[in-house]
Amino acid sequence: MLSSVCVWSFSGRQGTRKQHSQPAPTPQPPESSPPPLLPPPQQQCAQPGTAASPAGAPLSCGPGGRRAEPCSGLPAVAMGRHGGGGGDSGKIVINVGGVRHETYRSTLRTLPGTRLAGLTEPEAAARFDYDPGTDEFFFDRHPGVFAYVLNYYRTGKLHCPADVCGPLFEEELGFWGIDETDVEACCWMTYRQHRDAEEALDSFEAPDSSGNANANAGGAHDAGLDDEAGAGGGGLDGAGGELKRLCFQDAGGGAGGPAGGPGGAGGTWWRRWQPRVWALFEDPYSSRAARYVAFASLFFILISITTFCLETHEGFIHISNKTVTQASPIPGAPPENITNVEVETEPFLTYVEGVCVVWFTFEFLMRVTFCPDKVEFLKSSLNIIDCVAILPFYLEVGLSGLSSKAAKDVLGFLRVVRFVRILRIFKLTRHFVGLRVLGHTLRASTNEFLLLIIFLALGVLIFATMIYYAERIGADPDDILGSNHTYFKNIPIGFWWAVVTMTTLGYGDMYPKTWSGMLVGALCALAGVLTIAMPVPVIVNNFGMYYSLAMAKQKLPKKKNKHIPRPPQPGSPNYCKPDPPPPPPPHPHHGSGGISPPPPITPPSMGVTVAGAYPPGPHTHPGLLRGGAGGLGIMGLPPLPAPGEPCPLAQEEVIETNRAGNDLGVLEEGDPRPNGDPAAAALAHEDCPAIDQPAMSPEDKSPITPGSRGRYSRDRACFLVTDYAPSPDGSIRKATGAPPLPPHAGVSQAPPASCPTSTPTQQPGYPPSGRAPSPPQATPEAPAIFDVWLPPFHRSHQPPGKHQRGGRHPGVSPSPQQRACVGEPPSASHPQSLTLCISVPSSCHRLRPRETLGFPLSLPPRLATGNGGRECPRDPGLPFPSRHSSPAV
């Protein structure tokens, strides 16, 4: 059995490489040759020969945008003068980003399982971008980082460059298959500080997050959006940003509101206005109207704090004597007149405070009503402060007319609690970035504050004890307590003096009088300066880092759309310039001995185009060919381009399209309209098996390191080649257990000079109406080649705004478009054990970032890694192919 895999990686080489027309090098001897694999992209199938490439050859992207012929059944191409040796003394040339590096093969073998170690394997020329003309492997990666990676192979020590950003270095390490924990201790802080900065940057909301979310919620500009808004505001404890995200998720998901359910008119009104009103009072940078509301709130906060301070000034206080007649406690005695002294503030201050409380009450009620998550809202410390600062005023107004003793006690308590009003100052954090930075700095510097407190506590205890005994030296023997000549009568009193001295305040209320006490005081002052000077710079640096990051994020350019899909441009690795198809060889009955390839079949109404496919036999399951004639139909997938047209959307465009919610729908035959959720429609179709098994379940614990999380999520497999052989009855299925291929010319006994093809047998009443006829002769031993487009693999969904670092790796899960209907075996006598090989990002520790995975699509698929499952979760129901062989069923 033969299989070959054509892969289109986004990190392909930029520009056009020189095409070499030199003859193909001689393959490796049979005893050292690996299983047949696809030759490198530069390997072209010979035009003349006994068998030639099929017409309508599958479109694949080779170096420089040239089309690579999908030669199947050819042995691995031998490398040139450096790569073909196979011994440890042979040299190998690696071109990384235009910079050539030369090293020994034995050096690359020092770290087995990595990408560079794979260059020393016999089939490396087929698996990587190998140029036989220059005898070098090309990688379009960062050349500066690669120098450190290569030195790691040479010296065994991994150092981090100081001029490279940490996330970039981490991504490069993941591409080369190196664990970040191998970084040397001397460079760990340099490597870590970039990640700390990245995490700190994520703690501040992006300046366009609220604007985009409002726009996505629908009609945000009606609320007065300003395109020049700055950074979004958030609460002191970060709850504001989370509530914004919850609000926009709720609006986008169609959550119902108090006026009605999601499906009714009330729900529609709620979904439209809830995010707008919430942003109006919560995010001052979301719209121009929100700015006016923020200015009003800031004005009332300042007025309330000013009123609170003026109430204690003598100029605004009136002292009055009120006489109250009270019954005498003695029976029969006349009533007593009691004069009470009352302190009253100016009445206009009370009125001003009442107006401020009315505004705060209105603001609080609006935020509670339109909050997307009431529980999260009540957990916020700022919201608790708002509620506590409002309640005393209403209680005081309600109890002011009562004259009972209990009411007076409550009023006295409420007057004491009125100091909570001063906490409204923290509401300014919604309007000033510096105050939010201060809050982040205090939380980030908790360890430094604890260290400072411990140092001060130790110094206070030591110097308070020393000053007590130092002042006893030279004291009068008759003064036992020392109260006549010193202030330090006991050690606890010395605590206050030690704190004042170590913090260099020096109130002067206590000071030593003896020479020994003065010496202790000098030592205490010096120790205090050194103690405070050590952790303070760390705190200051944290504040500076947070503030600079906040300013940088606030000044980021406004991005309404993260990415605008556009077709690939000529010269990019995602643009195909297909060569004209070669002329068909002579008919085998005319003496050439070749095999006529079938014409390409283009299904009229399906989402997948199959180039060079063969018409199905009578036993082919209808689900296999659903949606078009003669093609391997996978529903809801983008079509392959016609010759001369650019390739489908580039990988980042596909990802951004999926993120925007523009997922491709399932297309029924003859129906160009999307049919709803691709996954639901595919699973509900009668021809589809229940393909709902994720690629890696969350409970499978893969040894993923922090450095390997989230890398290569933008990689994808562009083309996919199966190794189906048509059976004699005309159906296309895997020839499991079939004998090896006969010695074809140019396959095993001679250098590769042809591309063998095969056709199914002509059956009575075949092909069906409207399908292209098949050639009359069949060669069941030769493999049939199918090119199928698959969408990229995506990581499991996480809530928006969540940082994907820090140990939260959800695993890999197929997107809805990958839950494709392929078909079940129609009967036990005609099994269709389809096997597709696709290159996807690997999430395993110290494995190549792109591994070959097997899909037995006749059953609910589970992924089997192409590395033997050495460090990945095993599935007992599927065999694991060896690393250097094609997957087997």
Swiss-Prot record:
One of its GO terms (biological process) is cortical actin cytoskeleton organization. It holds the Pfam family BTB_2. Detected on Purkinje cells in the cerebellum molecular layer (at protein level). It is found in: Cell membrane; Presynaptic cell membrane; Perikaryon; Cell projection, Axon. The keyword Membrane applies. The chain crosses the membrane at residues 292-310, 352-371, 381-399, 413-435, 449-470, 519-540. CDD domains: BTB_KCNC1_3. Residues 1-291, 372-380, 436-448, 541-889 are cytoplasmic. Residues 211-222, 748-764 have a biased composition (Low complexity). It comes from the Eukaryota. It is a multi-pass membrane protein. Residues 24-42 have a biased composition (Pro residues). It catalyses: K(+)(in) = K(+)(out). Residues 10-66, 202-231, 557-627, 691-834, 852-889 are annotated as: Disordered. InterPro entries: BTB/POZ_dom, Ion_trans_dom, K_chnl_volt-dep_Kv, K_chnl_volt-dep_Kv3, K_chnl_volt-dep_Kv3.3, SKP1/BTB/POZ_sf, T1-type_BTB, VG_K_chnl. Residues 794-808 have a biased composition (Basic residues). The keyword Hydrolase does not apply. Its main location: membrane. The segment S4 is probably the voltage-sensor and is characterized by a series of positively charged amino acids at every third position. This is Voltage-gated potassium channel KCNC3. It comes from Rattus norvegicus (Rat). The lineage of its organism: Eukaryota, Metazoa, Chordata, Craniata, Vertebrata.
